[in-house]
């Protein structure tokens, strides 16, 4: 009887921790669902392992359910990422190249795509820990260069997020001028292929 009681006491902290993490994940999902759509300006600051600023930038960020995402870095070098709900388009104007991927591959590449994803099976691959008004998302199996994503809210509104990679770099994104997506803004999630660019189509050929 004593051995059984001891085993229960030892297991209790583990069960409690799992329940807390599950609650944290659900809280984050509820907050994101409450943010059905969002458009904002962003400022980007990247620091290296020594906390030295190695890059700054700015641009426009937008998201909408389901699986729609828009990222336009305007300074210092332009780049664009668009998820239309099915495919992911990555455009590098300087290189005159467009890469096309399945949206599922974006999820695999970075937890940041969870901001617009509701699939239970996908969320189960990540652990979520609440830290005051922030939530840290970590992949349970590290198979990409992204170690964690932290998203922070202010007055129930997404305020900033950061991405930590396996090289010790931290990319911080601070949002401003947040507003809901308008009918006009919905065009942001439809990528128009520019003329005279190289196209690297990495989508599953069986699906297209």
UniProtKB/Swiss-Prot annotation:
UniProt key word ATP-binding: no
InterPro entries in UniProt: LolA/LolB/LppX, OM_lipoprot_carrier_LolA-like, OM_lipoprot_carrier_LolA_Pbac
Any one cellular-component term (Gene Ontology): outer membrane-bounded periplasmic space
Alphabetized UniProt keyword annotations: Chaperone, Periplasm, Protein transport, Signal, Transport
Pfam annotation, one family: LolA
GO biological process, one term: lipoprotein transport
Signal peptide interval: 1-22
Superkingdom of the organism of origin: Bacteria
Matching Gene3D superfamilies: Lipoprotein localisation LolA/LolB/LppX (2.50.20.10)
CDD domains the UniProt entry points to: LolA (cd16325)
Cellular location(s): Periplasm
Function: Participates in the translocation of lipoproteins from the inner membrane to the outer membrane. Only forms a complex with a lipoprotein if the residue after the N-terminal Cys is not an aspartate (The Asp acts as a targeting signal to indicate that the lipoprotein should stay in the inner membrane).
NCBIfam families tied to this protein: lolA (TIGR00547)
Family assignment from sequence similarity: Belongs to the LolA family.
Record's subunit section: Monomer.
Protein name per Swiss-Prot or TrEMBL: Outer-membrane lipoprotein carrier protein
Native source species: Shewanella baltica (strain OS155 / ATCC BAA-1091)
Gene behind the chain: lolA
């Amino acid at each position: 009887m004593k051995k059984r009681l001891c085993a229960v006491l030892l297991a209790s902290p583990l069960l409690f921790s799992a329940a807390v993490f599950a609650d944290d994940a659900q809280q984050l999902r509820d907050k994101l669902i409450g943010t059905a759509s969002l458009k904002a300006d962003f400022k980007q600051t990247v620091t290296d392992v020594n906390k030295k600023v190695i890059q700054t930038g700015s641009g426009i960020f937008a998201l909408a359910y389901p699986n729609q995402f828009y990222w336009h870095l305007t300074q210092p070098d332009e780049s664009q990422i668009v998820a239309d709900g099915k495919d992911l388009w990555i455009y590098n104007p300087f290189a005159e190249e467009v890469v096309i991927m399945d949206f599922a591959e974006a999820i695999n590449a970075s937890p940041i795509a969870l901001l617009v994803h509701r699939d239970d099976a996908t969320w189960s691959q990540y652990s979520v820990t609440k830290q005051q008004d922030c939530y840290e998302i970590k992949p349970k199996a590290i198979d990409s260069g992204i170690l964690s994503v932290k998203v922070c809210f202010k007055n129930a509104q997404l305020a900033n997020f950061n991405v930590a990679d396996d090289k010790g770099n931290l990319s911080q994104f601070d949002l401003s001028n947040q507003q809901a997506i308008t009918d006009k803004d919905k065009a942001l999630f439809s990528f128009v292929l520019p003329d005279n660019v190289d196209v690297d189509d990495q989508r599953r050929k069986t699906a297209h």
